[in-house]
């Protein structure tokens, strides 16, 4: 299985633009079987304001139109997609990462660490997940961790398979810094794929590493 890491630009609260970027990356991924995007790529990481009324309107349900568009793209181009998004589930909001193939969401990971929002002011409807179990995809054991998950709870992601680690960082991942990320990933898994989106506001410098 060939995996593409899509370090493409996303824009805050511009789902239309970000969906076009997802399609562009899928097309440009050529013979990749799976294309992985960064954390909260659909809406943009800073789309979370920690104002509940604003955020619940911004968040996307699994059966929402934006997710339906990605499901459609997975069918059209016959590729699997992994993408970060701010998820709405009833009255609750999560930072999630969906695996979509053949027009269906086949796995949905919810971030377990709380520092994706201002937890000092958010209400109880901003939730974290609890399930970090590996899953099989095309015969490959995979685990997903979102950004701070792996810094705070590395022991929760130990696996002999492949770790997918979408992040959102606003500094250059130079040799020394990427080395620190590699060390952190190695605490959980021997093989890891890290993907960071590009963004002008707030700044995110991108990057894709194995």
List PLM regions with ranges.
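Active-site catalytic loop in hydrolytic enzyme cores
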Residues: 88-161, 174-179
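Amphipathic, non-transmembrane alpha-helical secondary structure
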Residues: 16-27, 68, 153-157
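Active-site beta-strand/loop signature of hydrolases that rely on acidic residues for catalysis
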Residues: 3, 18, 27-53, 74, ...
């Amino acid at each position: 299985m060939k995996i593409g890491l899509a370090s493409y630009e996303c824009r805050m609260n511009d789902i239309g633009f970000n969906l076009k970027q997802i399609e562009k990356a899928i097309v440009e991924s050529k013979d990749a079987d799976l294309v992985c995007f960064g954390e909260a790529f659909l809406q943009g990481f800073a789309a979370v304001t920690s104002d509940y009324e604003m955020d619940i309107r911004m968040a996307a349900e699994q059966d929402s139109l934006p997710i339906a568009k990605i499901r459609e793209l997975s069918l059209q181009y016959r590729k699997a997609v992994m993408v970060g998004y701010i998820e709405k589930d009833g009255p609750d909001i999560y930072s999630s990462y969906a695996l979509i193939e053949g027009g269906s969401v086949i796995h949905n990971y919810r971030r377990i660490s709380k520092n994706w929002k201002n937890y000092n002011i958010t209400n109880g409807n901003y939730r974290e997940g609890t399930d970090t179990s590996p899953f099989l995809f095309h015969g490959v054991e995979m685990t997903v961790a979102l950004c701070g998950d792996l810094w705070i709870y590395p022991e929760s992601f130990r696996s002999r398979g492949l770790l997918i680690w979408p992040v959102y960082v606003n500094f250059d991942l130079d040799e020394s810094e990427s080395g620190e990320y590699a060390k952190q990933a190695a605490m959980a898994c021997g093989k890891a794929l890290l993907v960071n989106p590009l963004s002008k506001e707030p700044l995110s410098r991108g990057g894709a590493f194995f």
